[in-house]
Regions:
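Conserved N-terminal phosphate-binding loop of PLP-dependent enzymes in the Aspartate aminotransferase
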Residues: 1-232
Length: 233
């Protein structure tokens, strides 16, 4: 299998370490691509970092001829306040992976997008250059119809207003809750709100707090999926 090199998430105070790790990985290895979740590391606990920092990382890759792949499966289609998290960037990725909210979560469907440069690399009469990749459900008519309906709704004035309304609600709640003694950190981006709970034994992502939180919400008629000691909406 191909080796995967991981770098630190470029959160506040960690920027230099992250850039140096990426540059070192490129200079000491034959790197095919830099794969990242833009602005929000979802399953890691909704860890957020700035567009400016990601721009710098992508710039390093472009300078060194390393392809960049944005995993927007979670962040895409309005989650961050814009259609894509990459819309906050100056530097754009070479590829994007999209799914989940593409169909409003109703039918499984995914899209991989490429720059024209990459597309042209496979567009040739010579079959040796073709990208022989496909699957049984390519261009599923029902999935495509659901995706078109979802995109139309996303672009509507009502949906865009709701995104802004939710974002402002999150900011207001953040101001109220962030000084609570049981709250360690809070963060907001678009319609994403994350709250990290302070625990006595400093449990985090892999602690037991997740089960306690999940059961508490279920008992109160609320369906949420805490990530460790982090509650997100």
């Amino acid at each position: 299998l191909i080796d995967v090199i991981r770098i630190p998430v470029p959160t506040s105070g960690n920027e230099t370490q992250s850039k140096e790790a990426l540059l070192n990985a490129i200079q000491t290895n034959s790197c095919a691509a830099f794969i990242f979740e833009p602005l929000v590391q979802g399953a890691a606990g909704m860890v957020m970092y700035t567009p400016e920092m990601l721009d710098e990382l992508i710039s390093i890759c472009k300078t060194n001829d390393v392809f960049t792949i944005a995993d927007e499966v979670m962040t895409g289609f309005g989650k961050t306040g814009k259609t894509f998290a990459c819309d906050y960037l100056t530097q754009q990725p070479d590829m994007m992976c999209l799914s989940k909210a593409l169909t409003g979560g109703t039918i499984p469907m995914a899209i991989t997008t490429f720059t024209q440069q990459i597309f042209d690399g496979f567009y040739d009469d010579d079959t040796k250059k073709a990208l022989f990749h496909g699957h049984t459900f390519t261009a599923n008519p029902t999935g495509c119809a659901a995706a078109l309906a979802s995109l139309k709704w996303l672009q509507s004035t009502a949906m865009q207003s709701n995104i802004q309304r939710i974002h402002q609600k999150h900011l207001s709640f953040q101001n109220k809750i962030q000084t609570h003694p049981k709250v360690k950190t809070t963060r907001v981006l678009g319609v994403i709100f994350a709250l990290e709970i302070q625990t006595e034994n400093q449990e985090s992502y892999y602690g037991t707090m997740r089960n306690k939180l999940y059961n508490f919400f279920i008992e109160n008629g609320i369906i949420l999926r805490p990530v460790g000691n982090i509650v997100y909406i």
